């Protein structure tokens, strides 16, 4: 098996069919492995800030896998920056052989150009993380570190929506859901338009005013517009007294829903963050969705939804011993401060 490097847009476009075929055969996958996500994120968001590095594993005329990578900030990393939730190589068979080839190539390139290899959000589900652990055992200055918890709700564990509601806390039902139901707050799925986006940005800005490190959603506008029009990304909103007061943007992929971006305004005592999730879960039952994945952050409010919790890991190969020591010291200090 050999490796071919793809570093130009037109060649990236040519990969769509083979990429999709492999994705369809993968047992553990997410929307962040699709060609649509990777191409559009790179093209619309990252392409001026990074160097494209798609690796294609092939044998003769047959293509067996892809590594969706970029070189950015002196690191080799997955496409998606900090805004994707599950990282993985694109391969369905001969995975160990393919991932070993990918690692050999990126390690050689990293050594030649003094780059770090930083692969984030590798899920513990499936076998890719285990394969990568074995591969990097003999690679100097490497580490595998638990990065973040994820939360997901398997709807097949309950007989129906009513049965699921009995599993969540009575406090959540009484304080968060019932008041919103009585207030006749409207949940709807909408298609992208500029007026809708302006309301989404306003809701997000309103929420950010309560937080440290204020940000905006301007980075998300082009990718949300494109993927919504492509049918991969849905936009849901809550309306109260004719005004949009909450939004929840989610991927619909391979029988599962993946919550990606959400925010809400402060309206009286309504707990709109909870209610918009309630509405999405109710819709999921009607649409025969199998899993509602709340993705990063197994916070208490997500556990209230009777979610299953798993973990994502980061794999880093540092260009020097000193950089590894500096990073591990920083993480230990950060954890100490958080616990304190």
Regions found by a protein language model. Name each.
Residues 1, 85-87, 185:
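Short amphipathic alpha-helical segments
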Residues 3-60, 64-76, 122-150, 156-268:
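A conserved beta-strand-loop-helix scaffold within acyl/acetyltransferase catalytic domains
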Residues 5, 129-162, 240, 287-340:
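Active-site/acyl-donor-binding loops of N-acyltransferases
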Residues 58, 97-108, 206-328:
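Aromatic (often tryptophan-rich) hydrophobic motifs at membrane interfaces
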Residues 82-114:
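A gly/proline- and charged-residue-enriched helix-loop-helix capping module
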Residues 111-127:
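ATP-hydrolysis module of ASCE/P-loop NTPase motor domains
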Residues 117-120, 188, 291-293:
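Short catalytic-loop micro-motif centered on adjacent basic/acidic residues
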């Amino acid at each position: 098996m050999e490796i071919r490097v793809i570093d130009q847009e037109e060649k990236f476009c040519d990969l769509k069919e083979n990429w999709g075929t492999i994705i369809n055969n993968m047992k553990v996958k997410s929307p962040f492995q699709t060609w649509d996500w990777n191409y559009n994120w790179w093209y619309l968001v990252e392409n001026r800030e990074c160097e494209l590095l798609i690796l294609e594993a092939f044998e003769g005329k047959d293509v067996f896998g892809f590594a969706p990578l970029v070189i950015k900030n002196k690191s080799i990393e997955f496409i998606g920056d900090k805004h994707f939730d599950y990282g993985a190589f694109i391969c369905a068979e001969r995975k160990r052989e393919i991932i070993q080839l990918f690692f050999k190539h990126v390690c050689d390139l990293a050594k030649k150009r003094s780059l770090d290899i930083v692969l984030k959000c590798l899920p513990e589900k499936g076998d890719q993380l285990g394969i990568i652990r074995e591969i990097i055992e003999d690679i100097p200055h490497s580490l595998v570190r638990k990065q973040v918890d994820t939360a997901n709700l398997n709807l097949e564990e309950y007989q129906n929506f009513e049965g699921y509601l009995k599993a969540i806390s009575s406090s959540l039902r009484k304080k968060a859901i019932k008041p919103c139901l009585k207030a006749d707050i409207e949940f709807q799925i909408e298609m992208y338009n500029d007026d809708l986006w302006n309301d989404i940005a306003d809701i997000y800005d309103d929420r950010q005013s309560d937080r440290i490190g204020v940000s905006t959603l301007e980075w998300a506008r082009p990718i949300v517009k494109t993927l919504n029009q492509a049918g991969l990304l849905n936009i849901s909103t809550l309306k109260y007294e004719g005004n949009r007061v909450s939004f929840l943007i989610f991927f619909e992929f391979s029988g599962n829903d993946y919550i990606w971006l959400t925010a809400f305004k402060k309206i009286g005592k309504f707990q709109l963050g909870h209610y918009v999730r309630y509405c999405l879960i109710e819709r999921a039952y009607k649409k025969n969705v199998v899993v509602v994945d709340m993705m990063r952050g197994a916070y208490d409010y997500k556990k209230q939804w009777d979610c299953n919790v798993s973990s994502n890991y980061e794999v880093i190969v540092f260009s020097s011993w000193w950089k590894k020591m500096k990073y591990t010291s920083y993480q230990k200090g950060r954890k100490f401060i958080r616990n304190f």
